[in-house]
Amino acid sequence: MEMASAFTLNVRLDNIAIITIDVPGEKMNTLKAEFASQVRAIIKQLRENKELRGVVFVSAKPDNFIAGADINMIGNCKTAQEAEVLARQGQQLMAEIHALPIPVIAAIHGACLGGGLELALACHGRVCTDDPKTVLGLPEVQLGLLPGSGGTQRLPRLIGVSTALEMILTGKQLRAKQAVKLGLVDDVVPHSILLEAAVELAKQDRPSSRPLPVRERILAGPLGRALLFKMVGKKTEHKTQGNYPATERILEVVETGLAQGTSSGYDAEARAFGELAMTPQSQALRNIFFASTEVKKDPGSDAPPAPLNSVGILGGGLMGGGIAYVTACKAGLPVRIKDINPRGINHALKYSWDQLEGKVRRRHLKASERDKQLALISGTTDYCGFAHRDLIIEAVFENLELKQQMVAEVEQNCATHTIFASNTSSLPIGDIAAHAARPEQVIGLHFFSPVEKMPLVEIIPHASTSAQTIATTVKLAKKQGKTPIVVRDKAGFYVNRILAPYINEAIRMLTEGERIEHIDAALVKFGFPVGPIQLLDEVGIDTGTKIIPVLEAAYGERFSAPANVVSSILNDDRKGRKNGRGFYLYGQKGRKSKKQVDPAIYPLIGAQGQGRLSAPQVAERCVMLMLNEAVRCLDEQVIRSVRDGDIGAVFGIGFPPFLGGPFRYIDSLGAGEVVAIMQRLATQYGSRFTPCDRLVEMSERGESFWKTTATDLQ
């Protein structure tokens, strides 16, 4: 039986050809290699029909034009040459579309990304809808690749080299208004008239290319170009720390096309695409992509989730305000905040106002839409309006008795089906549910700060939590735009447990005489977004160290922090950025200056700041402890799979994505190498570096955590 075509041709009475894109059986249109023959057959028909006046590409999907190329195609390539051939095939197809003698227009609604935007760029004109779902971008760099079907050559010529570089190097996505302003699209229209607007454009002569702004014309010249690429190269190197080869190749390929012409540019693009596809960085980033896609599809349990119509939040502080924002503005659910103090409610409302007003100022949101979303949030100082809430998220102080009291109050004031979800970061969920009348409806829902930015949540069922409670909480987290992992109710859960030894070791090196900026720079060079000491300042030194005694009580001295260091810092009223006193100096608000260490820290903790370790030695000590603890978490079934362990570390603490997560990284080094490093460190620095039994066993057997396919071991 012949497979239904993803591309179908219909010719209207006015001799405009409509090519409809609709990949059978898929929610998203993605480009596959086998579609090339379908498109070529259509191009042949178009060339043979001399009556045609124009062509329009349009999607039949309700919320996407083309979301990109199918990434599995790259995984199927065994060599750089095979991946290069794939890119050349894409380039050739786009060239054939562009070579049609009549106007070809892309009618864009929804996501137009990667290969989808490259197809749109090959058209002679583009019209898109003003819908918030419509975004245009080239996100290949986030997979360790570059656009391989002509994007690196067409985009700079259309919108200018500096703007194109920003899009390609960051994977930045543009909304409709930004796209038309930059000249990426020719018109923005309501969805209802998209096709007709594209048809009208197709009836005209080919849209003439918009003259580039003077600045872009100067930067395209030899002198301006040399200056631009030097400046962008320096900035990119600082940002990536040399850990992402794709950025360097993007700069090289774009410059080749501008300096030597498009033919050389396309050649360089295809070659670079093939070589990048084989890099360990790209393979790791693609694995993270596949794993996060799997996690988003995981229901958390076998039971069907209960309906979610409205949510309540206890506590209007920083976390409560952030949770209210993602619940109302991302999940679209009515939220009622209870706080004993009206100021707490006002704080939470202002939190959402500030987030939404920022979007209005950046023209990402209409004022009317802001008001509509804010109307979903209300507040109260008692339980008025809580009677029929389906799920209550508790975000009060980390105090067990207080949280137990919250459970009792919710059970008295809410419906019998209401789920109680605690945002605790350190208290056992089983203890919070200890006196509950309905313990099966108590669960942990651990968000990370800042809530609106951090993609991960940990969902923590205790021994009596029902399967439906798990499924419903997972469903809510996904609605909030989060990536949820289900973890076991053990001290520190997963993320904080693997983070604590990493932070502790950084503090220990500080007491040994290593400089703060050296420790942080070493871990940033390794691939973390910020160093461990700066991270403590950002989350709050008091908040970040609160978990340490809990973990030490549960797991012993391997979690003990260097004696008296943390207490000395806290006793000096140093809480980090939030009170302007931490390891670093904080100037006036809004000033963007290079971070400087507060020199008063060293005498305070009795350290000299005269370190002897190299950056790789510093990183090794912090990271090895994190890897060892991650393996222990898998062994104790704190995490359900290595997939969840990798996603939790990358999305929860910024473990370097190009390494693929702790378990992928151990596999890339080899368990034997990790054990050898840890045994050496144990000899040098103490028993906390002793590799766990699972690692030693895997080393002896030559085993790895992941199979060679994209499925995990469990």
Curated annotation (Swiss-Prot):
InterPro entries linked: 3-OHacyl-CoA_DH_CS, 3-OHacyl-CoA_DH_NAD-bd, 3HC_DH_C, 6-PGluconate_DH-like_C_sf, ClpP/crotonase-like_dom_sf, Enoyl-CoA_hydra/iso, FA_oxidation_alpha_subunit, FadJ
Involved pathway(s): Lipid metabolism; fatty acid beta-oxidation
Enzyme Commission code(s) on record: 4.2.1.17, 5.1.2.3, 1.1.1.35
Region described as Enoyl-CoA hydratase: spans on this chain: 1-190
Entry coiled-coil feature ranges: none
UniProt record, GO biological process: fatty acid beta-oxidation
Signal peptide: none
Location in or out of the cell: Cytoplasm
PROSITE patterns associated with the record: 3HCDH
Annotated spans, 3-hydroxyacyl-CoA dehydrogenase: 306-714
Biological role: Catalyzes the formation of a hydroxyacyl-CoA by addition of water on enoyl-CoA. Also exhibits 3-hydroxyacyl-CoA epimerase and 3-hydroxyacyl-CoA dehydrogenase activities.
Record note on quaternary structure: Heterotetramer of two alpha chains (FadJ) and two beta chains (FadI).
UniProt protein name: Fatty acid oxidation complex subunit alpha
Encoding gene (name): fadJ
